[in-house]
């Protein structure tokens, strides 16, 4: 394992949060960490390999990132831990429960999938070609694409709400790095749903109704494959639904974790 940059707050039962592609550990700090700390949990967030303050490594795979998360849980001696993941982070959590089930007591998977459908295969291929071409999009166009990919129509049609995101995305455009390019490939390369039928831990899968990156029907497939899977869909939310609808998402996660054994 490389040196992962992580934050560890609180003293209750541990919850490990795994961010999506391009997201640093601080992704969870505006909304989820305060809610979980208030509920008495210990919150561990970290920068995935290739992003943030963690070494900007390259040449890694999904298996490498799964091993990183496993090593963090083992190093902190917090197994079995509750785990929360979104998008790529949810996929990492799923694969972790396949190879090291003893490390995870229960999990919440948001905006996830166990396979790529035809549209998502094409989207990934197109994004890989953009990265590999070396073309850097103008910040405003990059912001436009991120808005359309990540938010619901409700947010996009709200002048106040969308204005804040326009400003943020325009000021902080995505920079192409080897690490971010590797993260793009940290997605299902085959249909992984059959493997998930052996996961015994209780899992809540949360889908976001307006998600075009990982549409909710793909998340429902994961829940259906899990022996102890549950599914919940949040309305008026896109791929970043945990930012758009934090109260609804946090309430669902905390209710779920309270209902299952640590």
From Swiss-Prot:
Protein residues bound to substrate: 21, 87-88, 120, 239
Active site: 87, 211, 239
InterPro entries hit by this protein: AB_hydrolase, AB_hydrolase_1, AB_hydrolase_fold, Epox_hydrolase-like
Keyword Repressor (UniProt): no
One GO cellular component, as annotated: membrane
Keywords: Oxidoreductase, Peroxidase
Source taxon at top rank: Bacteria
Pfam (any one): Abhydrolase_1
Molecular function GO terms recorded: bromide peroxidase activity
Family the UniProt entry places it in: Belongs to the AB hydrolase superfamily.
Self-association and partners: Homodimer.
Matching PANTHER family: AB HYDROLASE-1 DOMAIN-CONTAINING PROTEIN, HYDROLASE, ALPHA/BETA FOLD FAMILY PROTEIN
Name of the protein this chain belongs to: Putative non-heme bromoperoxidase BpoC
Upper taxonomic lineage: Bacteria, Bacillati, Actinomycetota, Actinomycetes, Mycobacteriales
Gene that specifies this protein: bpoC
């Amino acid at each position: 394992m490389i040196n992962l940059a992580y934050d560890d707050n609180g003293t209750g039962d541990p919850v490990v949060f795994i961010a999506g592609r391009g997201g640093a550990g601080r992704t969870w700090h505006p909304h989820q960490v305060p809610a979980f700390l208030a509920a008495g949990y210990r919150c561990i967030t970290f920068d995935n390999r290739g992003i943030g303050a963690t070494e900007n490594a390259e040449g890694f795979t999904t298996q490498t990132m799964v091993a990183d998360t496993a090593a963090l849980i083992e190093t902190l001696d917090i197994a079995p831990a509750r785990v929360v993941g979104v998008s790529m982070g949810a996929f990492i959590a799923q694969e972790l429960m396949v190879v090291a089930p003893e490390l995870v007591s229960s999990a919440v998977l948001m905006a996830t999938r166990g396979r790529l459908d035809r549209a998502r295969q094409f989207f990934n291929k197109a994004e890989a070609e953009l990265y590999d071409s070396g073309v850097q999009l103008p910040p405003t166009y990059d912001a436009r694409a991120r808005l359309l990919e990540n938010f619901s129509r409700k947010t996009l049609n709200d002048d106040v709400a969308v204005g804040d995101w326009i400003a943020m995305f325009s000021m902080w455009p995505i920079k192409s790095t080897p690490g971010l390019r590797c993260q793009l490939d940290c997605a299902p390369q085959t249909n992984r749903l059959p493997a998930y039928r052996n996961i015994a831990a209780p899992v809540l899968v949360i889908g976001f109704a307006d998600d075009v990156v990982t549409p909710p029907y793909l998340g429902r497939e994961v829940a259906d494959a899990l022996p102890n899977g549950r599914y919940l869909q949040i309305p008026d939310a896109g791929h970043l639904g945990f930012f758009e609808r934090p109260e609804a998402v946090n309430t669902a996660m905390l209710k779920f974790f309270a209902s299952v054994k640590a």
